[in-house]
Amino acid sequence: MARVDGRESGELRPITIERGFIANSPGSVLFRAGATAVLVTAQLSESVPPFLEGKGVGWLTAEYAMLPGSTPGRKRRGPDGRATEIQRLIGRSLRAVVDTRALGPWTIHVDADVINADGGTRTAAITAAFIAV
């Protein structure tokens, strides 16, 4: 059975990955899966949250947002339950594969911004974040 966009049920969306998309960010990726596009940056700061101070481990945190023009109807700026859930999921997913002990007292800040939403934004953001880190 074909989907609305013409793909077969087992066919993936075309994927493109453009690393180094933002010159001022040590890790940046423009990730596209079909018409969905997510821009992710990863940057370091020499600090950790208070609960980790003095423990010799680092941290990874994530933020996720959908730009107002990313959906057919204008998406309001600001936090909402879905965005909060997704940014926590991104953080947890990456902390599961990043050796925070090797970071020392540093934090990796991941920012994921959906610039065009056409389905699969959560998985696109997680994948792009992994590439950016």
Predicted feature residues:
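Short, structured loop/turn "capping" segments at alpha-beta junctions
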Residues: 100-108, 121-123
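Glycine- and Gly-Pro-enriched alpha-helical subdomains that act as flexible
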Residues: 118-133
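Short, Gly/Pro- and small/polar-rich lid/capping loops
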Residues: 1-25, 29-32
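Conserved beta-strand segments that form the floor/walls of ligand-binding pockets within enzyme
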Residues: 61, 109-113
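A short, contiguous, amphipathic alpha-helix enriched in charged residues
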Residues: 2-10, 84-85, 129, 133
